[in-house]
Amino acid sequence: MTDHQLLSASGLGYDLGTRALWNGLDLVVARREVLALRGPSGAGKSTLLRCLGGIERPHRGVVHAGDVDLHHVPARVRRRIRRDVLGFVMQDHAIVPEWTVGANLRVVRPAGVTRATLDARARDALLVVGLGGRSRERAGQLSGGEQQRVAVARVLVQRPRVVLADEPTASLDDVSAERVRRGLDALRRSGSAVIVATHDPGLVEWADRSLEIGVEHV
């Protein structure tokens, strides 16, 4: 996997009933690069992220994580790539409310990482997102904005090559939104590529470039 092409897509198309949601879509992201996906609600930004992450299959085209064709490999290989290469920050947080904050962070344990290293990463990640010292709190007792910060901290612990973030600052208060942005920037500075679907002008300005979905790709 080269720095010049951590994740790429070629000729992607996705149909919603008889309508093409998008078609002929190409993109490439490299190390430390941020790509913002823009477009109106319903344009298919979230669907595109799921296709790029191997969660959903596009109707046309290919997605490569490095040199691996993500949708034409055995499920076990795709799971390994999602564990070690791709990180996700989705709108629903994907937080287990009954678990502690720390347990939610440790659920993503990359291959070869010891428990001691995982714990150290978790402490550092919580400091970055402004939740230092709260690892023993039950995640379900946190506010929605704080839970989104935990989701970002979890990706900081994982340290993936590519981060896929779906409206990570939507409906957050100013403090939580800024902490989420800070966490995403820490990921970029550590070497991750970031693809973020967003309406947040701050995130669009932060990105190296943007791609308008639902305009030139139909």
Q: What is the meaning of each model-derived region?
A:
Residues G53:
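Helix-to-loop junction immediately C-terminal to a conserved catalytic motif
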Residues G61-D69:
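Conserved ABC transporter NBD signature motif
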Residues L70-L86, R189:
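ABC ATPase NBD coupling module
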Residues R106-D119, V128-V129:
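ABC-type ATPase nucleotide-binding domains, specifically the catalytic core motifs of the NBD
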Residues V113, E137, V157-Q158, S190:
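Conserved signature/switch motifs of ABC ATPase nucleotide-binding domains
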Residues R138-L142, E146:
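Conserved ABC ATPase signature
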Residues V163-D166:
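Catalytic Walker B motif of ABC-type/P-loop ATPase nucleotide-binding domains
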